Structures are given as C-alpha cells and as structure tokens.
Swiss-Prot record:
The UniProt record lists the keyword Transcription regulation: no
Lineage: Eukaryota, Viridiplantae, Streptophyta, Embryophyta, Tracheophyta
Catalytic reactions on record: NAD(+) + H2O = ADP-D-ribose + nicotinamide + H(+)
EC class name: hydrolase
Keywords, in A-Z order: Hydrolase, Leucine-rich repeat, NAD, Plant defense, Repeat
Keyword Repeat listed: yes
Annotated active site: 84
LRR repeat ranges, renumbered to this chain: 609-631, 632-654, 655-677, 679-701, 702-722, 723-744
E.C. no: 3.2.2.6
Descriptive protein name: Putative disease resistance protein At4g11170
Written domain comment of the UniProt record: The TIR domain mediates NAD(+) hydrolase (NADase) activity. Self-association of TIR domains is required for NADase activity.
Source organism of this protein record: Arabidopsis thaliana
Domain TIR: 9-173
Length: 1095
C-alpha cells in the first residue's frame, strides 16, 4: 500500500450512500456537523447518476483522506453505489484511504454475507451482470463490512452518534502521518509488507517480528510504522533498546522482569512514579485497551515474557511489533508473523549513500565511480551507507581517494560498535565459529565447514551455524552455501587483530599480507596461530621462507596461499621455501598453495589430517612415495600441474569425492588404486594430453561427472561407473562408448565433440543431451533415437558425411545441424511446438525436408531464439511480405489493435555471419519503438547462400487503450530489421510478418489465407488434400520399417517402448484426418469432397 501522505488532498471526507435512505435525514445532519467542524466533504449534488461511476467520482475518491460508507437497506439496489464501493476499497489498498463504515438500520452480517433484505436487493441488482462484476461487488461488500464500524444497536440516539462519527473523523484527520520518513529509500515497500502482516483492521491481538542483521534498518522501519499508526490506538509506546534495559546489576530474574514492566508501564501510561509489585500488572492495566507496542532490539526471550507473554494481556485489535537480530527468539515465543529485512539493491544502496554524501539521490559526475566503490565497501548495509556518506560529505576528490584504502582495512567506529553487539552476545564456541567463517571460510558449503572445523562432532558445528543464522550473522542458502556480510567479515578480522595488536604471530588467524609476510620472514609465528590466508598477489617483494618458519606453529590447521588474479604459468612465484619447509605441520586440514614451487613434498610430510589438498599450477612432479594415511581427504586438486608425471597410491583415500587432474599434461596413467575411491563424485582429466591408460573393470558407484576433454591419446573408454550423469569426451580418440552405457540409469548428457566416432551403437535410454559435433567420420544417426523419451537437445554440426536424420522423439526441443554439408533427408516431422532448429549451410536439403522444417516453424510456439535454414524468399504463409529490411501494414488490411504477437521472417544475404538482429516495432501512438533483439546462435559460420531467419515476438507489456487511442485507433504498424556485426553484418534482403492470435493454441492459430497440413501448403483445391494424405500415408508406412531396424539395434528391454511408438504412429494418421476436416471448414469446403480421403 502506498503512503497516503504523498497525495494532494482536495477533500477530507468522501461519503458513499444510498440517497433515498439517508439523504434527507441522517446524512443531511451528518454533513451539517462536518461543516461546523471544518471538515471538507465531497458533495455530488450536481452529478447525474448513471449505471457506472465516471472519472469525476473516481478522482474525488482518490483525492479524499477518508471515506464514510453509509450502509443502508437499499444501498445494494444501486449498481452506482456498488461500483463506488469497489473504487473505495481499491483506494484503501493502493493509497491508504481510510474507510469508516456506518451501518444505518442494517446488520453488518447481512452486508458481509449478502443476506436478509439487503441481500435480496443485491440479488436484483446482480441480474444481467457479468460473473466478474458480481464477484467484485461481493468482495467489496465483505471487505468493507469486516472493518469495525458503528452498529445501530450501539447508538443511544442519532444526534449523539452523529457527534461521535464527527469526532472519529477529526481524530483520523489529525492522525495524518508526518513526512519524517518519506525520503527514506525503500520505506514504502517495507511499510506495505508490515501492513500485510499486521492486518490492522482484523480482530484479535497480533504480534509481528522484524528480524535481520544489525544496521539493516529494523528500528527505522519500526519507527516509521509507529509514526504512521500510533494515533489509531488508545495507547502506544515505542520502547527502544530493550536489550540495554534488562541488565540492572544486583537483580535476580524476577526483579529484572518487575523493573522492565515498571519502566514499560510508566512510559506507556505517562506516570513517572508508577510502582509495579507483581508480574500481572501489564494484563491488569491493558487487557481492555487497544494498544500499539514496539519492542525494539530484544535479545532475550525473558524480555518478551516480561512484556508480552500472552496475547490476552492486551485488548482487542492490539498490535505488538518486536525487532531483533535473533530469528530463533521469535520462533521460541511462537511469533508466526515475521518480516526479514533484506539488504537494499545496488541502486537503492547508492541512493542512500548519495543522500548523506551529497544531499541528493545521485552522485556528481566526477565522484560517481568513487561513490559506487564506497557503496560496495559498505556492503549495502544502510547504517554503514549513512555513516560513510556523512563522513565523506563536503570533501574533495583527493580526500575521497585517500580515504578509500584506509576504510577498506578498518571499520568505522560507529559501525563496529553496532555490529559487535551481535558478536558479543555469542557463546565462546559460537564466537570461534564466527571467526573461522569471517577469516577463512565465507562462501563455503555447510558440509565443508563440518569437515574442516575442529569440533566435538558435526552436530556441534551445525548447531553453531544455525545460531549464527538466526542472529543474522551469516546467511544460509538452500544449496547449503554459507555467506557472511563483508562488514561482518571485517568485524571478525578486527576482533582477531585486537587479540595481539603489535605481535601478529600471537593471533588466531593471519590475513593481512604485510603482517603475514612479516611473521613468515621473521619466524615469529606461535602455537596460537590456527590459520593463514595470504593472497600472494599482494606480496610486493620476493619472500623466502626458512626451514624454521612453521616450527613454532605446531597447531596450524589451515594454510592458504592463493592468487586472486588469474595464474599465468610464466608468472614469477614470489614465495619461495626450502625442501623441508612443510615438515612441521602435522595438524593441517587445509593445504591450499597455488603455484607451489617445489617438485616434491618433503619426506617427513604427514597428510593424515588433510581434508583438502589444493595445489593447482604447482611445479610438482610427484607428491610422495608409498601409501599415505589419507583417511580424511575429501578433495585433491592438482589442476594445471603440468609437470606431474605420476599420481601416488590412493588406496587409503576412501573418502575422496573430488579429484581434479585437469591439464596435468605429463600424466600418463591413473593408478590402479583408484578403484578404492568408492565415494568419488567428480573426476576431472581434461587436457591430460599424454593420458593413455585408465584402469579397466573398476566400478566407482558414486562417480557422477567424468571429464576426458582433449585427452587426445585416449582411445578406449573404460567400464568405470554406471551412475555417471555427465560424460565429456570432447577431442578424444575414442571411436565408440562401451556397450554398458545403454544400461546407465542416471546419465543426462554425453558430449563427444571432435572425437573419432564412426558409428553410434549404444545410447542410454534416459539421455537428455547428445553432442556429436565435428565427428567427420560419422555417417549415420541410429533410428532408435526416436524411442528416447527424455532426449531434448541434439547437436550434429559439422558432421559432414551424415546424409539423413531419423525421426526424433517429440521431447526434442533443440536441433543444431550447422554445416552438415551432405544432409538431404529428414525422416518424420518435428512435433515439439517449442523446438528450435538451426540448419545453417545445409545446402543439400531436399524439398520434402525443407517442407518439414517449414511446417515446424509454422506451428511451433517460438521465443526470441531464431530458426535458421537455407532459403531465398519469404514463405507464402507469411501474409505480409516486403523486399528490403522494413515492412509497413495499414489498418485497412487488419485490425491492429487486436494483435500483440507476431512471427517474423528475414532473408539474410550470403557471404556474412549472422551476428544477431535488432527488431523495432513502431505503432502510431508509441512514444518510442518497442525494441527486441534476436541473439546470434553460439555457432554462426559464414553463410554460403541466402538463409531464412524466423522467430516469434510479443509486444510487451500490453496496456489498456487510452481514451485518445479509442478515438484515434492505430492506422499503421511498421517493423524494421537491422542485423548486427558492423561492417560484416548480413544484408536483410526480404522480410515478412504474420499476425498471431493472442492465446490460441491449435495448429490454426495463425491468421493466414493458406492452410498447412502434413508437409504441404493447400488452398481451395482438393488435389492438395490428396497430396497431403499421400504424404502422411507414406510417412505412416515407413514407421513399421523403422521399427524393424530399431528392433535389430535395440535389446529386448526396449520392446515395450517400440510397441508404444508404433501405436503412436497409427494414431497420428487419425489426428491428420481431424486437422483436414477443421481446415476444410475454415476454407468453406464441403466435407463431402473429403470422403475419398477420410474413410
């Protein structure tokens, strides 16, 4: 609901009434009372009543602060009144119009349920009206009657009630919210969300929680809410800093609660000397009062028990709002209505910063890039944005540039003070977990943290993570990833720095590059150090580590020497160490060392505690000899260790789930011990150019992802797992996959691009994606592909010897066949209405094949992705065609107001690449053209001939016509096309356009003078129908032949699928007959002429 304070009001009150019931009695006295009190009321005496309310009445409702709805017995007999009520309730929702129902000699229940005499009048009014209009009236009546109003049974006399209504109106007018919070970015959305949770007009007592991290704006939202609505309650209180008021020294739990209640009631009732002697005081004083209570910054469940233990403590329609960092506190108090305050968007954050830095919503041009950097530095936290913005206000560009590096390394004092409150409230083990995440592990998965962090058990870590999440100190995503806000990470680093300000070697974690280099070079590390995280890109000079550097760091658990910039193999390594430099690290769980400079690990290295070994781009030739105790190892990453010749024995690494050996160009074979990796999920072997040998007959039951890209010497694929989901064999010398592949039950994708495949014999039944690009020796695609029910994408581009493509299953949604130079025949039609086709440079496609492609393009529901195929002219089924790159259609040819969906066709000239296309739609009254972009295909070679490019568009968003548009309908539509690519862009030689029905889904949803059936285009001649039936019979008869071939190629396990497909082929002919009959009716043909072909 938008804030009403932003409106320009003309009236205080808009009355809605049935004149014959109240105009000359009750209403006249009420209006006179309003006038005497200075209440400006809208009068409709001069307006002529009709069946619908006009623009003048709608404007009056929207320009009023309050609407008084006088329900009377005949109110519902007027469609005018009912439409008026709909508009009133709409304004209530959209702009905060206050609605006061008055029930004049009518029961609210009759209005709510449309019963009694009121209901009878309503039913008479509904006669002849649409269902939608009746539904809207009922909803408005019910919603309005649910608002608490004045019932005639509660009136002593009319004169007294008129005075009471007048008084209530004045109170509501005086309660108009101030503008103190109008300029706060995003506040309108926050208030709208809170209003939906509070349900201010509903009965009963409701408690709503606002939770989120410190500094995100919870208190500000609560204050804005209080400011807007406190006048609507008998009593109201904003009790700030509840956390601080609950720590009086020398008091027990009972005494603290008494003290808190006394402070609360004293402020609420404005009685300074009030004394509370028992914990029932709040209930005694407030059980009959409608109160608004804001409890700000609550951090202890006992505080809630003291101030709002039970809903029955408060009167009907009371509302309590609790702000806290701790979600679990709200859950523990059974508060089910909660609002989590999110960080502002990038644009909102920049606006907040600029309001405080420049006193305007956007930065000056010379400081724009710095303002964006400061906004990023603040991590979009509103508190930090306000503090940093105020700090930089009035300073010159040089001061901005000077301040940025300092603020990056140190928290502002005010921001730190606010954020540290949440940290200080943690238990010791939770603080320890917080520091681990802040310094080392932000962005990691929850399971990873359980493996890495030393604790009594996994549950201990899980519980701690949940506490941190509930207190808004971390964010847990659905996929298990753990994130900590940048300012909270900075807080954690500051806490660690203060552990030993002048001796970094005595801190828990080392992260600052300069300080870390000092500790390493001077050998000042101690047993306190648990982790080191050093970005080697920040090392200024070459750093030499001695043999004794790690000697005193006997408790070091995490060693992370990483490079934040891309690693170049020619890059000079600035960190050097002796051969025995790692011999003193028996507790290591994480060893991450990019570009490790030695060829071997020292002989004394003991990796028994290692969970992750990450040595990408290392100089390693060999890790170690013999069998090492690797029982805890989960991840081994040796990616781009180009000198690695041999992998160690991994028989003890039974928990390993990720093994990355990509770009290990000297590696010749995998050890036979790999068979022990029963928990291995990913095996990455891409670009292992010398790899020739993989152990055979091993079954890794957990293996799901397998990459052998560009293992150019690998000729055979081993029987390695039956649970693989992704198999990547790009650029290998493999000629075929093993027979067992057809039994794989989990495989989604097989990619054999640039392999040596000669024939495809075995394909899994559950396959979804099949890539066979650039297999130049491949000549045939097996017919049994049409029986793969999940197959969605096929890519046979650059398979230059493929002559025909078999019938494909209806599940296929993308077929790419670029530069298939020999492709001539397509068996079967493309039945998926959302399929995308790319036949660039398939110049030998026969006429029948092209007809099938055109049929698919004609009937399918496309998107902005274009279908491309050879062709010289726009097909005839595009009703509007033109030479050149634009087309104009006048309204005397078609009613342009009815259509927002189009199919377009371009003829692209030969000799250039298709790099995408810009399309602009001009209508007569568009302020500017609607622009769309047809993206280029991932593979778009030089066009060897003219090509057709076809796709579908919808002009978005559609809008109801304005009065001007109704009086001046569109007279033309112009569409222009311009291909992209600069000097090398394709020429648009012709273009065509076809209007589409808005939501029609049948094959005839296109408005065309032609009818397309079964592969041909027909007009009014029966001979065309005969040709179509012949085509379809030919197609159907080929089904049985294909089934015979498929039966020879398939195992007996596929028989049921084949029989099912045969039945589908039989049913298809019946479907075609039905299409013919429908088409004949559309063309005005007699069904008698169809009998010879439809028997």
């Amino acid at each position: 609901m938008a804030s009403s304070s932003s409106n320009s009001w003309r009236y205080d009150v808009f009355p809605s009434f049935r004149g014959e019931d109240v105009r000359n009695n009750f209403l006249s006295h009420l209006l006179k009372e309003f006038e005497s009190k200075g209440i400006v009321t809208f009068r409709d005496d001069h307006i002529k009543r009709s069946h619908t309310i006009g623009h003048e009445l709608r404007a009056a409702i929207r320009e009023s602060k309050i609407s008084v709805v006088l329900f009377s017995e005949n109110y519902a007999s007027s469609s005018w009144c009912l439409d008026e009520l709909i508009e009133i309730m709409k304004c209530k929702e959209e702009q905060g119009l206050k609605v006061m129902p008055v029930f004049y000699k009518v029961d609210p229940s009759d209005i709510r349920k449309q019963t009694g005499k009121f209901g009878m009048s309503f039913l008479e009014t509904c006669c002849g009206k649409t269902e939608e209009r009746q539904h809207n009236w009922r909803r408005a009546l019910t919603d309005a009657a649910n608002i608490l109003g004045d019932h005639p049974q509660n009136w002593d006399n009319e004169a007294y009630k008129i005075t009471t209504i007048s008084k209530d109106v004045l109170e509501k007018l005086n309660a108009t919210p101030s503008r103190d919070f109008n300029d706060l970015v995003g506040m309108e959305a926050h208030i709208a969300k809170m209003e939906s949770l509070l349900c201010l007009e509903s009965q009963g007592v409701r408690i709503v929680g606002i939770w989120g991290p410190a500094g995100v704006g919870k208190t500000t939202i609560a204050r804005a809410l209080y400011n807007q609505y406190h006048e609507n309650f008998n009593l109201s209180i904003f009790m700030e800093n509840v956390r601080e008021s609950y720590g009086e020294a020398g008091l027990d739990d009972y005494g603290l609660k008494l003290h808190l209640q006394q402070r609360f009631l004293s402020k609420l009732l404005d009685q300074k000397d009030l004394r509370v002697r028992h914990l029932g005081a709040i209930e005694e004083r407030l059980k009959s009062q409608k109160v608004l209570i804001i409890l700000d910054d609550v951090d202890n469940i006992e505080q809630l028990k003291a101030l709002a233990k039970e809903n029955q403590w408060f009167g009907n329609k009371s509302r309590i709002v609790v702000t806290t960092q701790n979600k679990q506190l709200l859950v523990s108090h059974d508060i089910n209505h909660m609002y989590q305050v999110a960080y502002p968007s990038k644009q909102e954050a920049l606006t907040i910063f600029c309001q405080h830095a420049f006193k305007q919503s956007s930065p000056s041009d010379d400081l724009k890039h710095l303002a964006i950097e400061f906004t990023t530095l603040a991590g979009h936290l509103p508190l930090a944005l306000r503090v940093l913005g105020s700090f930089m206000r009035g300073k010159g560009k040089e001061e901005w540039e000077f301040s940025l590096p300092t603020l990056k390394s140190r928290l502002d004092g005010e921001v730190e003070k606010v954020l540290k409150v949440g940290y200080d409230g943690l238990h010791d083990h939770e603080k320890d977990l917080f520091l681990h995440i802040a310094c080392i592990f932000s962005g990691q998965h929850e399971n990873y943290l359980k493996q890495m962090i030393i604790a009594n058990n996994d549950t201990y870590v899980s519980f701690g993570l949940q506490v941190l999440a509930d207190k808004s100190l971390i964010q847990k995503f659905e996929n298990g990833r753990i994130e900590m806000h940048s300012l909270l990470r900075q807080l954690g680093k500051e806490v660690v720095r203060k552990q030993s300000i002048y001796e970094p070697g005595k801190r828990q974690f080392l992260m600052n590059a300069k300080e870390t280099c000092g500790v390493l070079s001077n050998n000042t590390g101690t047993g306190t150090v648990l982790g080191i995280s050093l970005d080697m890109c920040e090392i200024k000079e070459e750093l030499y580590i001695s043999e004794k550097t790690f000697e005193e760091m006997r408790n070091l658990v995490y060693l992370k020497f990483y490079m934040s910039s891309p690693i170049d193999d020619k890059m000079k390594v600035k960190l050097q160490l002796p051969e025995e430099g790692l011999s003193y690290l028996p507790q290591l769980r994480l060893l991450h060392w990019d570009a490790y400079p030695l060829e071997f690990f020292p002989s004394s290295f003991r990796p028994e505690c290692l969970v992750e070994l990450n040595m990408s781009h290392s100089k390693l030739k060999k890790l170690w000899s013999g069998v090492q105790p690797l029982r805890n190892l989960r991840t081994m990453n040796l990616n781009s260790s180009r000198n690695l010749e041999i992998l160690p024995n991994l028989m003890e690494a039974t928990k390993l789930n990720r093994l990355d050996l990509g770009w290990c160009e000297s590696l010749v074979e995998l050890p036979s011990s790999i068979k022990n990796l029963q928990h291995l999920i990913l095996l990455e072997m891409s670009c292992c150019k010398k790899l020739e040998i993989i152990p055979t007959n091993i079954n890794l039951p957990s293996l799901e992802v397998l990459h052998f890209r560009y293992c150019t010497r690998l000729q055979t694929f081993p029987e390695i797992s039956t649970n693989i989901r992704l198999l990547n064999l790009i650029g290998t010398a493999i000629t075929e996959v093993p027979p067992s592949v057809k039994y794989w039950s989990k495989i989604d994708e097989i990619c054999m691009e640039r392999a040596k495949v000669k024939r495809l014999v075995h394909v899994p039944y559950v396959l979804e994606k099949l890539c066979l690009r650039e297999n130049k020796e491949l000549e045939t695609i097996p017919r049994y592909l049409k029986y793969l029910p999940r197959l969605q994408m096929i890519d046979i581009s650059y398979c230059i010897n493929i002559i025909s493509l078999p019938k494909l299953p209806g599940s296929v949604s993308a077929l790419t066949a670029v530069n298939c130079e020999s492709l001539q025949i397509l068996h079967g039609h493309f039945r998926n209405k959302s399929i995308h086709l790319n036949f660039i440079n398939c110049l030998k496609l026969g006429q029948r094949a092209q007809e099938k492609i055109h049929r698919s393009v004609y009937i399918h529901q496309s998107s902005y992705i274009a279908d491309v195929l050879p062709g010289e002219h726009v097909p005839a089924y595009f009703s509007y065609r033109s030479t050149g790159s634009s087309i104009m259609i006048h309204s005397n040819k078609v009613d342009l107001s009815k259509f927002n969906r189009f199919k377009v066709c371009l003829v692209l000239g030969a000799g250039k690449r298709f790099e995408g296309c810009d399309i602009k739609f001009y209508k007569q009254f568009f302020c500017k053209p609607r622009e769309y972009y047809v993206p280029k295909h991932l593979d778009s070679p030089l066009l060897k001939s003219d090509h057709l490019c076809m796709c579908e568009f919808e002009l978005m968003p559609p809008h109801p016509p304005t009065e001007w548009e109704l009086l001046h309908p569109n007279e033309f539509l112009e569409v222009s096309f311009e291909s992209r690519g600069g000097l090398y862009k394709c020429e648009v030689k012709e273009c065509g356009l076809q209007f589409l029905e808005p939501h029609e889904t049948s094959e005839f949803r296109y408005l065309s003078p032609h009818l397309y059936l079964g592969g041909s285009w027909i007009g009014n001649s029966s001979s065309s129908i005969e040709e179509i039936i012949h085509v379809d019979q030919e197609e159907s008869s080929s089904d049985s032949e294909e089934i015979i071939y498929a039966d020879q190629e398939e195992s007996s396990s596929g028989i049921e699928e084949i029989i099912h497909a045969e039945r589908e082929g039989t049913n298809r002919r019946k479907s075609v007959m039905r299409w013919i009959k429908v088409g004949a009716r559309k063309m005005g043909l007699s069904l008698e002429c169809l009998k010879p072909w439809t028997r």
